[in-house]
Curated annotation (Swiss-Prot):
<dbReference type="InterPro" id="IPR011869">
    <property type="entry name" value="TrmA_MeTrfase"/>
</dbReference>
<keyword id="KW-0949">S-adenosyl-L-methionine</keyword>
<protein>
    <recommendedName>
        <fullName>tRNA/tmRNA (uracil-C(5))-methyltransferase</fullName>
        <ecNumber>2.1.1.-</ecNumber>
        <ecNumber>2.1.1.35</ecNumber>
    </recommendedName>
</protein>
<feature type="binding site">
    <location>
        <position position="218"/>
    </location>
    <ligand>
        <name>S-adenosyl-L-methionine</name>
    </ligand>
</feature>
<feature type="binding site">
    <location>
        <position position="234"/>
    </location>
    <ligand>
        <name>S-adenosyl-L-methionine</name>
    </ligand>
</feature>
<feature type="binding site">
    <location>
        <position position="185"/>
    </location>
    <ligand>
        <name>S-adenosyl-L-methionine</name>
    </ligand>
</feature>
<keyword id="KW-0808">Transferase</keyword>
<dbReference type="GO" id="GO:0030488">
    <property type="term" value="P:tRNA methylation"/>
</dbReference>
<dbReference type="InterPro" id="IPR030390">
    <property type="entry name" value="MeTrfase_TrmA_AS"/>
</dbReference>
<dbReference type="GO" id="GO:0030697">
    <property type="term" value="F:tRNA (uracil(54)-C5)-methyltransferase activity, S-adenosyl methionine-dependent"/>
</dbReference>
<comment type="function">
    <text>Dual-specificity methyltransferase that catalyzes the formation of 5-methyluridine at position 54 (m5U54) in all tRNAs, and that of position 341 (m5U341) in tmRNA (transfer-mRNA).</text>
</comment>
<dbReference type="GO" id="GO:0000049">
    <property type="term" value="F:tRNA binding"/>
</dbReference>
<dbReference type="InterPro" id="IPR029063">
    <property type="entry name" value="SAM-dependent_MTases_sf"/>
</dbReference>
<dbReference type="InterPro" id="IPR030391">
    <property type="entry name" value="MeTrfase_TrmA_CS"/>
</dbReference>
<dbReference type="Pfam" id="PF05958">
    <property type="entry name" value="tRNA_U5-meth_tr"/>
</dbReference>
<feature type="active site" description="Nucleophile">
    <location>
        <position position="319"/>
    </location>
</feature>
<feature type="binding site">
    <location>
        <position position="294"/>
    </location>
    <ligand>
        <name>S-adenosyl-L-methionine</name>
    </ligand>
</feature>
Length: 361
């Protein structure tokens, strides 16, 4: 189910999501959820478009689900950031005026930030050479953006291969590198609200935090300021490198980051086997009071769920309330919901982001 873009119906759609979250969490005696709304338009900081040839020209195109041969041509995209909407016609004019930029271009990706940074990735069905690089450099300068060209097995970077975001959490501004191609939260305004909620929910602690699925350090940076130490895990090499840069950039020095899956971490904590990636890290020295999880849509697998059960507090951000409810059902005999929230990351769709703080009974 997906609703049409209609700002006048936003409140009704949000009410329906709140009702759905209440319904899913009711069996667990959840308190009333805090609700964090979204800007009604221009909230999405990244967008990806295929290009479609019509009347001898390439146009931005999107496709309805299951209709990959029926393009919807667009000139603007009201849910995308104002910066993306300003860049779209200028980029289109550039590829239409330049054979070098337009030839066999099939996809364009925009990444922008609340801090005003922007990056454009242009994907081609042909090799890219110095002639392309010359024109792309002129384009990047004219638009004030970084430009990345991608073709099979090759990537050319004009400027930087990341965008810089700055987010204010409880009066402190954190700076984030967002690498090209890596996951970032698409709705920057709601992401900032999410970070503030998590910061408040964890509280000021004298013990340590274990974070699973830390990504580029989106939550790691502010949460690290609330605890003694953090051990964070992530399996994506790109995200790990971004997180390490972000920790350094923000002078956050109480975090150790390791490339382990949740399953491997469970084995390490249970002393099933040693891991070379944990060399120099004494797991027994940590006094974990809270585990923070932000899993993919499938939620936590049963073994990871059992891993979280051993912690006094579980702070859980979910992009799928159904799998969140299933995980809580597995944990409800030992943990109860102390607070919960809905974050409207994805207006005009049925998708919702939610958060719960579970504490041991």
């Amino acid at each position: 189910m997906s609703a049409a873009f209609d700002p006048s119906s936003y409140a009704t759609q949000l009410d329906a999501k709140v009702a759905r979250l209440r319904e899913l969490l009711a069996p667990f005696g959840a308190p009333e959820p805090a609700v964090f709304d979204s800007p009604r338009e221009h909230y999405r900081l990244r967008a990806e478009f295929r290009l479609w040839r019509e009347d001898g020209q390439r146009h931005y195109a999107m496709f309805a689900p299951g209709e990959k041969h029926k393009a919807i041509l667009i000139d603007d995209f009201p849910i995308a950031s104002e910066r993306i909407n300003a860049l779209m016609p200028r980029l289109k004019a550039a590829w239409q005026a330049s054979e070098e930029l337009g030839n066999r271009l099939f996809q364009v990706e925009f990444l922008t930030t609340l801090a005003g940074d922007a990056m454009i990735t242009m994907c081609y069905h042909r090799p890219l050479d110095e002639a392309w690089e010359v024109e792309a450099r002129q384009l990047a300068e004219a638009l004030g953006v970084s430009v990345i060209g991608r073709s099979k097995g090759k990537r050319l970077v004009i400027g930087r291969d990341y965008a810089v975001e700055k987010l204010d959490v409880a009066g402190r501004v954190f700076s984030y590198r967002q690498p090209e191609g890596a996951f970032t939260q698409p709705n920057g305004a709601v992401n900032q609200k999410m970070l503030s909620w998590a910061f408040e929910a964890i509280g000021e602690r004298e013990d340590d935090l274990l974070e699973l699925y830390c990504g580029n350090g989106n939550f790691t940076l502010p949460l690290a300021t609330r605890v003694r130490q953090v051990l964070a895990t992530e399996i994506s090499k790109t995200s790990v490198n971004a997180a390490l840069s972000n920790l350094d950039e923000n002078a956050v020095d109480n975090v150790r980051l390791v490339r382990l899956s949740a399953e491997e971490l469970t084995q390490a904590l249970n002393e099933v086997r040693p891991f070379r990636r944990l060399e120099g890290i004494d797991l027994k020295s940590y006094q974990f009071g809270t585990v923070f999880v932000d899993p993919p849509r499938a939620g936590m697998d049963p073994d990871t769920c059992e891993l979280t059960r051993r912690f006094e507090r579980i702070l859980y951000i979910s992009c799928n309330p159904e799998t969140l409810a299933a995980n809580i059902a597995q944990l409800q005999d030992t943990h109860r919901i102390e607070r919960c929230a809905l974050f409207d990351q994805f207006p005009y769709t049925h998708h919702m982001e939610s958060g719960v703080l579970l504490v041991r009974r």
